[in-house]
A protein has these predicted regions:
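Amphipathic alpha-helical segments enriched in hydrophobic/aromatic and basic residues
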Residues: 35, 44-45, 55-56, 66, ...
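An amphipathic alpha-helix adjacent to DNA-recognition modules
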Residues: 21-29, 41-42, 53, 62-86, ...
Length: 215
């Protein structure tokens, strides 16, 4: 056996980096489970480190505050939404099918993880309103929808009478508006409203048909 092909022992720096990654992941997983069960406000840092079986000092080595941890989880949620939309675009060809499929998936996931979703979405929206990092997350959401609309314009199922940026604003604004209404109104029929919104947007953005003769 060639000695050069044998596995090389990890350096102390490599082991420290691996342990750090593992600790980070354990904190995130423990926090997510607790936020899902109790909500953000009812969960303390001591609760999180206890569930993760880590020292409090380790938590603060990774996150300066509990709010910073929630922000990282919120960013991950937006990344998950981006992947869902990308996957839906690979499965479907029309704007109506893409928005309908994506809105349906998101609505189902949000309602299943209701407590956690409320905290994460509130964090994104509050951060945006105060000029914080939530702005970045909302920009990512808008950019993802912009790509879907731009593709629809190229395929011909989205009209070109409005500017692309306006159309992207309409889609992102409608999606966020429905989610906001769900956040603020107990019992709001999120899944149904998202489905209706997707259908409305597809119809509103469809190319205008030229008037027929005699009309």
């Amino acid at each position: 056996m060639d000695p050069s092909s044998a596995p090389q022992p990890r350096s102390p720096a490599d082991r420290r980096h691996r342990r750090s990654r593992q600790s980070h992941a354990r904190i995130r997983a423990a926090a997510r489970n607790l936020f899902l069960e109790r909500g953000f406000d009812a969960t303390t840092v001591d609760d999180i480190v206890g569930a993760a079986d880590l020292a409090q000092k380790t938590f603060f080595n990774h996150f300066p505050t509990k709010d910073a941890l929630l922000q990282e989880l919120a960013s991950s949620v937006v990344g998950h939404f981006e992947r869902l939309l990308s996957d839906e675009c690979k499965r479907s060809d029309s704007l109506e099918a893409r928005l309908g499929g994506f809105f349906s998936l998101v609505g189902s996931e949000i309602e299943v993880t209701r407590v956690l979703s409320r905290d994460l979405l509130h964090r994104i929206i509050r951060g945006s309103a105060s000029g914080g990092t939530g702005n970045q997350e909302l920009r990512r959401v808008r950019q993802a929808f912009r790509g879907v609309v731009a593709d629809g314009r190229e395929r011909g199922d989205v009209g070109v009478d409005l500017e692309l940026e306006v159309q992207a604003d309409l889609v992102a604004g409608a999606f966020i508006g429905v989610v906001l209404q769900w956040l603020n109104e107990p019992g709001y029929p999120l899944a149904g409203r998202l489905r209706e919104t997707a259908n409305f947007l597809a119809a509103a953005l469809a190319p205008r048909r030229a008037p027929g003769r005699g009309t």
